A protein has these predicted regions:
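Short Gly/Pro-enriched turn/cap motifs at secondary-structure boundaries
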Residues: 113-122, 139, 169-172
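Alpha-helix capping/helix-boundary segments
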Residues: 37-39, 66, 155
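Gly/Ser/Thr-rich phosphate-binding loop
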Residues: 3-6, 29-34, 43-114, 127, ...
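Residue-level signal for inorganic ion chemistry
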Residues: 24, 32-35, 178, 186
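Conserved ATP-binding/catalytic segment of the ANL
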Residues: 140-141, 147-193
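Conserved AMP-binding/adenylation subdomain of ANL enzymes
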Residues: 1-30, 45
Length: 193
């Protein structure tokens, strides 16, 4: 935001939905991020009040999966796109973003919603795969679970002077500990942590 000359609005800790709605309305916030529980609380608050959040365009969410109902209600009631993201500090921090591929925009809403419910596609310069307990790559069929492994220019190559490194990497891949499925389009869905 600073690089592009955009205004940044910072929040206090432990904000209530009313505080968030007031900031969005008062500061004309267009883009914000957070965990799903924040946006569930805000949605419930907005449905019962008259705050103007029409400036808001997008909300990337991470830390947990956002319920499909949350994604759909923000889109239908407020025109806000909720975007799943997945990452870790070890990835600086974004590993995936969920967006529709161009040809998917013509799909029926139910099918698009199913895609939006996933954690997304690999970010630029991040490769990903899922492996079984024997280290074999699982198929990208949307149903075979495996541990998510990543590598790339923004992914750490080792922990500095830390014995965790030996258990955290396999053949140059960082082992995340998250269990995912990967569909034929390359979208991941976290199924266990």
């Amino acid at each position: 935001a600073t690089w592009l000359g955009c205004k940044q609005v910072y929040t206090a800790s432990f904000m209530q939905p009313s505080d968030i709605a007031e900031l969005i309305q008062g500061e004309q916030v267009t883009y914000t991020a957070g965990v799903p529980t924040i946006w569930i609380g805000l949605l419930n608050f907005l449905e019962a009040t008259e705050y103007d959040v029409s400036s808001l365009r997008r909300i990337p969410v991470g830390g947990a999966a956002a319920p499909s109902a949350l994604i759909e209600k923000f889109a239908k009631q407020f025109g806000v796109e909720i975007i799943h993201a997945w990452g870790m500090t070890e990835l600086s921090p974004i590993g995936t973003l969920c967006y529709l591929k161009s040809y998917m925009h013509d799909w029926p809403e139910e099918k698009r919603s199913a895609v939006r419910a996933k954690q997304g596609l690999a970010s630029p310069n991040v490769e990903l795969r899922a492996v079984d307990e024997n280290g074999g790559e699982v198929p990208w069929d949307g149903s075979s679970p495996g541990e998510l492994q990543v590598r790339g220019t923004s992914v750490i190559s080792e922990y500095y002077r830390d014995e965790r490194s030996a258990d955290s990497f396999m053949d140059g891949w960082f082992c995340t500990g998250d269990v995912v499925t990967i569909d034929s389009e390359g979208y991941i869905q976290i199924v266990d942590r």
